[in-house]
UniProtKB/Swiss-Prot annotation:
GO terms for biological process: establishment of competence for transformation. The keyword Magnesium does not apply. The gene is comC2. This is Competence-stimulating peptide type 2. Acts as a pheromone, induces cells to develop competence for genetic transformation. Keywords: Competence, Pheromone, Secreted. GO terms for cellular component: extracellular region. InterPro entries: Competence_ComC. Belongs to the ComC family. One of its GO terms (molecular function) is pheromone activity. It comes from Streptococcus pneumoniae serotype 4 (strain ATCC BAA-334 / TIGR4).
Length: 41
C-alpha cells in the first residue's frame, strides 16, 4: 500500500511538471505516466 501512495504522489508531481513544461520533456513525462498507469492496473 505504501508503494501505491508513493506512486500517486509521484504522478501528482508529474502532472504539475506537465502543466509547467511543454515540448520534448513533456512527451517524455507522458510516456513515464502511461507506463506507471499500465503497471498500476
Amino acid at each position: 500500500m505504501k508503494n501505491t501512495v508513493k506512486l500517486e504522489q509521484f504522478v501528482a508531481l508529474k502532472e504539475k511538471d506537465l502543466q509547467k513544461i511543454k515540448g520534448g520533456e513533456m512527451r517524455i513525462s507522458r510516456i513515464i505516466l502511461d507506463f506507471l498507469f499500465l503497471r498500476k492496473k
